[in-house]
Regions:
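Long, contiguous N-terminal structural blocks used for assembly/anchoring
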Residues: 1-65
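Alpha-helix boundary/N-cap detector
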Residues: 15-23, 73, 77-81, 97-101, ...
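Short, flexible helical or helix-coil boundary motifs
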Residues: 31-35, 89-93, 117
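Acidic, low-complexity, intrinsically disordered interaction modules
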Residues: 62, 77-95
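Charge-rich, solvent-exposed alpha-helical interaction surfaces
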Residues: 26-30, 42, 81-88, 109
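Acidic, serine/threonine- and proline-rich low-complexity regulatory tracts
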Residues: 69-71
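Short, compact, well-ordered microdomains
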Residues: 92-120
Length: 121
């Protein structure tokens, strides 16, 4: 049996985790197909430049940017921001299982990406 001293956290470590373009596309697809619809007013592709992407949810992984409109304010979404949202999710939830994500998980990731925290829901 471990002593109280042995059970205490010694610190934390950051473990690099691969996030694929497919993961990012799926995250945004879930968000845009309803997961974040309760707080997002509308989404636009910056300069209407899809960069070869078939869907708006794929623009980020093709190097484009999105404008996300919320409560009359415009927020820019980029790939580095979305990756930061993924990182915050993994750190705060202590897991990264994109194959098991549902609309709630992806909504949280998008809010982390745009606001650094969960603001809605």
């Amino acid at each position: 049996m471990q002593t109280e001293h042995e059970r205490k956290d010694a610190g934390t470590i950051t473990v690099p985790t691969a996030v694929s373009n497919y993961n990012l596309d799926c995250i945004l697809s879930y968000c845009f197909d309803g997961g974040s619809g309760y707080w997002i007013d509308r989404i636009e592709v910056v300069d209407d430049d899809y960069r070869g992407a078939k869907y708006g949810s794929e623009v980020i992984t093709h190097g484009g940017k999105l404008k996300v409109f919320v409560d009359g304010e415009e927020h820019l979404l980029t790939k580095p921001m979305l990756l930061k949202g993924c990182e915050l999710y993994a750190i705060r939830r202590k897991e990264w299982r994109p194959d098991d994500f549902d609309a709630e998980d992806t909504d949280i990731i998008l809010q982390y990406a745009l606001f650094g925290d969960v603001v809605y829901g």
